[in-house]
Amino acid sequence: MAAAPASIPDRARVVVIGGGIIGTSVAYHLGQLGWGPETLLLERDRLTSGTTWHAAGLMVTFGSFSETSTRMRHYTRDLYARLEAETGQSTGFAPIGLIEVAADEGRLEEYRRVAAFNRLMGTEVHEISPREIADLFPPARTDDLLAGFYMPQDGRVNPVDATMALAKGARMRGVTILEGTPVLDVLTTDGRVVGVRTAQGDIECEYVVNAAGMWARQLAERSGVTVPNQAAEHYYLLTDPIPGLDPDLPVLEDPGSYGYYRPEGDGMMIGLFEPVCAPWHVDAIPEDASFLTLPPDWERMGPYLEKAMARIPASMEVG
């Protein structure tokens, strides 16, 4: 647990609770709007703790029929591309491209509709053949695929670096960020926010942004607010080095095989999209879960992992 600050302010206009990718983004954008000196971000442990630090780091614009969601994806990609020049802190964004593949007629029809909408929204999308998929991503088995959809401007981002860049940008605009400062309660009067309570004392404020990640629901419950948010188990596998693997291959997503794939170091990251997820700690998320990893559940995930690895035959030959 991060050390508590020596002192805390007694007032802010906005208190942002949580220092993951969402909380730091909110703080950064409040700073852009001129609210920086009146904004306080409180992180219970260290920035990125919870779920941000081990996110897979995919930057995907494809997949939505929502105009709002698609515009946000475009904005986010552009933001990650320019933050380093603005802050001096890299986000790790690499526009290596992303390929969504379809192995059945139903998914192909769905993806063609998605592609048409995304093109309308300004996304660069190319429908490509199995041969072209193999050219772009040689480790993949492609003989059973019907087509792919290639977004050359998408790619990967480092979630820790991106969070730190947003935090630095927020500080540059006057936002105060305190680590080691868990919020114990949100204080209200007649249903209106008047402050937050911490172990170091109360802080008056007009607005609270609950960006507490997997703790958001239980924090909101203390104020009688329902946040429909539940942590779930998610697994990805990092293989041993694969000889000859190009580290700049595009990201490959194959929901039909329950998998997504991208190079990680000299090996491959294989993430799983299991059709039925497993909720984690439904009653309450442990307070000491800041940088927790879960032991593998081979009995539940084994069949999905085997199918996902079959898309990348070389992954079955290494550890």
Where are these regions (language model features)?
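Dinucleotide-binding Rossmann-like beta1-alpha1 core, especially the glycine-rich loop
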Residues: 57-136, 256-261, 265-267, 288, ...
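Gly/Ala-rich phosphate-binding loop of Rossmann-like dinucleotide-binding domains
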Residues: 27, 31-32, 169
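Helical element adjacent to the flavin cofactor pocket in flavoenzyme catalytic cores
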Residues: 149-207
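Central helical "cap/lid" subdomain
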Residues: 202-250
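Glycine-rich FAD pyrophosphate-binding loop
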Residues: 31-53
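Beta1/beta-strand and adjacent pyrophosphate-binding region of the FAD-binding site
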Residues: 8-22, 40
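Conserved Rossmann-like nucleotide-cofactor binding loop
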Residues: 22, 47, 215
